Amino acid sequence: MVPLLLLVTAGALRGQDNGKPTPVESVDLERYAGLWYEIARIPNRFQNDCVGAATATYELRDDGRIDVINRCTKENGETKEARGEARLDDKGGARLQVSFFSILGWRPVWGDYWILDLGEDYEYSVVGEGSRKYGWILSRSPTIEDERLEALFESLRSQGYDPAEFEVFGAAAGAAGSGS
């Protein structure tokens, strides 16, 4: 679970490190905090009962961690909510680890959350991880222009992702549902 100035951003030009996607160099987590709308995602097991787009809210904590609240609507109209936390995995803030559940109720299970592309004004974010099994395009607004979405898919392609794997929810018109 759970982010429009240039059509091709620096993230698209960095390439790959050891065959893995390359996160942006740094992220100001205070600016990153807040509400994000899911524009597109690679379908995954923990969102398989969500219909349409989800939202993610990130709130900074005093201990340096981040509270994560993901919400989506289920087919029956109910809101599904998942609460978790994130912690920094690097000094630049672009590599985080998130946990939404624990083993035996006390040992968290952490997953990678890498910010691969980020708008200069923090108006969009592209999130992924090393295996490319998971990926999201997030925006500060519920929709995104088709041209911006296509540029973000190009950024993902340059990072080794296949845009056709993405399910699109918040595109303006023409790109909706295309993922390519």
Regions found by a protein language model. Give the residues of each.
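Bacterial N-terminal signal peptides
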Residues: 1-9
